[in-house]
Swiss-Prot record:
Belongs to the ferredoxin--NADP reductase type 1 family. CDD domains: CYPOR_like_FNR. Its main location: plastid. FAD binds at R148, L149, Y150, S151, C169, V170, K171, Y175, V186, C187, S188, T227. Its EC number is 1.18.1.2. Pathway: Energy metabolism; photosynthesis. This is Ferredoxin--NADP reductase, chloroplastic. One of its GO terms (biological process) is photosynthesis. It catalyses: 2 reduced [2Fe-2S]-[ferredoxin] + NADP(+) + H(+) = 2 oxidized [2Fe-2S]-[ferredoxin] + NADPH. It is a peripheral membrane protein. GO terms for molecular function: electron transfer activity; ferredoxin-NADP+ reductase activity. The lineage of its organism: Eukaryota, Viridiplantae, Streptophyta, Embryophyta, Tracheophyta. Its cofactor is FAD.
Length: 369
């Protein structure tokens, strides 16, 4: 049985052949057995009829060794029974908007909204998956708009604890192009403008990259910028705001959240409540680029904040039960790599190869845009 702990959801305002290759395919005589079989040719007699001849030819060649048996992969993540692509673009699930709230301050550089949609238990997603949204209307060619994918911001139980809703965290996209025209993102504006009761077409769920690890004692390091916080909110709700018969988190969750201004901090109050609730299991660090600097006077981007704990994080990352997740703006990825390259090099380790091994072990998970 799974229940949700009562917790207020507060939101602030690549064939070639060669002679050598052919030579290597000659069969050794000691591996050939012979028997008589008829071989036909065209008789040169006046009758023109076919006549038989007999010849000694190879008929039994040693069989090649069998191919090695495939080893079944066992994921370290919560993949058992996972549902993928239940609803597709041509047959979406039509849900309804239950809640739509702006969660950035009025002076924040851009609007971000938290929205909740009903699915009545028909979209059995997992923490770390995404859903597609098909906005109403048509494109400039008169065709229905294509879906956009959004990371899910709620646990599998949803914000209301009944496993009948799904939440998204969406930033309204508005920008000025080179011609000086104001451009509005089709789907983001559609979503941010939704009123409670309005219908919305949903697809999915999709994705396995960002699923949580099974190990309840794992160390989970999460780096998110802006709306990249979405999958981590879903993780953290499961860890700290819910009670499950088959899962109790006893490890360490460490969240780094990067935003431009303090009024852009998303779900700040929720995360602070989690820290109060489980101080030994949850660490929280913000990076506010336009308001904070490091000791060198450099702007506090998420990689800058992470650099302050570089040695500690590196030691954690060398352990088999540490999982690293990154979601948000692609720009932060290089900054993180730069830090890790020097730390790894100090121990004679090639970071690029080491990261490849981490990815193979499902310990390095990235979803950036």
């Amino acid at each position: 049985m799974t229940t949700a702990v009562t917790a207020a959801v507060s939101f602030p305002s690549t064939k070639t052949t060669s002679l050598s290759a052919r030579s290597s395919s000659v069969i050794s005589p000691d591996k050939i057995s012979y028997k008589k079989v008829p071989l036909y040719y065209r008789n040169v007699s006046a009758t023109g009829k076919m006549g038989p001849i007999r010849a000694q030819i190879a008929s039994d060649v040693e069989a090649p060794p069998p191919a090695p048996a495939k080893v079944e992969k066992h994921s370290k993540k919560m993949e058992e029974g996972i549902t993928v692509n239940k609803f597709k673009p041509k047959t979406p699930y039509v849900g309804r908007c239950l809640l739509n709230t702006k969660i950035t301050g009025d002076d924040a550089p851009g609007e971000t909204w938290h929205m909740v949609f009903s699915h009545e238990g028909e979209i059995p997603y997992r923490e770390g998956q995404s859903v597609g949204v098909i906005p109403d209307g048509e494109d400039k060619n008169g065709k229905p708009h294509k879906l956009r994918l959004y990371s899910i911001a709620s646990s599998a139980l949803g914000d209301f604890g009944d496993a009948k809703s799904v939440s998204l965290c969406v930033k309204r996209l508005i920008y000025t192009n080179d011609a000086g025209e104001t451009i509005k993102g089709v789907c983001s504006n559609f979503l941010c403008d939704l009123k409670p009761g309005a219908e919305v077409k949903l697809t999915g769920p999709v994705g396995k990259e960002m699923l949580m690890p099974k190990d309840p004692n794992a160390t989970i390091i999460m780096l998110g910028t802006g709306t990249g916080i979405a999958p981590f909110r879903s993780f953290l709700w499961k860890m700290f705001f819910e009670k499950h018969d088959d899962y109790k988190f006893n490890g360490l969750a460490w969240l780094f959240l990067g935003v431009p201004t303090s009024s852009s901090l998303l779900y700040k109050e929720e995360f602070e409540k989690m820290k109060e609730k489980a101080p030994d299991n949850f660490r929280l660090d913000f990076a506010v680029s336009r308001e904070q600097t490091n000791e060198k006077g450099e702007k506090m981007y998420i990689q800058t904040r992470m650099a302050q704990y570089a040695v500690e994080l590196w030691e954690m990352l060398k352990k088999d039960n540490t999982y690293f997740y990154m979601c948000g703006l692609k720009g932060m990825e290089k900054g993180i790599d730069d830090i890790m390259v020097s730390l790894a090099a100090a121990e004679g380790i090639d970071w690029i190869e080491y990261k490849r091994q981490l990815k193979k072990a499902e310990q390095w998970n990235v979803e950036v845009y």
